[in-house]
């Protein structure tokens, strides 16, 4: 009977530890990339076309940069992404917003005034089309004292700008297309 039992019990431990290590690495990878996949899915759901990293004229002041501009069934949507982890304290009237995480505290300027400037710049180009803007905080951010006006989560963005009736959305999109082409012509850094 002894000849059937393994002589060295550690010979099974090493492969088991290796499998557990690989499984842990895979789970960490999945967790880190799931947010990016979800972001891509929501962007594809709300946007029928998209321009990233464009520069548009802004009145007499020169130019302004826009990170993400979407053609949606409701018009044009400007999205600024804030990838912060922790509790965010901010309001419409506060000049600086604070983030408190487990290991640090920091502040950043209220992003709403610059978003209003971006909305105005795009509105000047596509005058007859609704232009909205949202500051998108990803899943690591939590607002415990109320959410400022233009702030949105991924779920809220999908709910507000997603369109269930794809046929009706297509008609609206076709009406917005000439204005979308205007923004493409006016923009620098965007594909033509």
Q: Where does each model-flagged region fall?
A:
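Surface-exposed interaction regions that form or flank ligand-binding interfaces
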Residues: 1-64, 70-76, 85-87, 101-192
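Amphipathic, interface-forming alpha-helical segments with heptad-repeat character
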Residues: 82-98
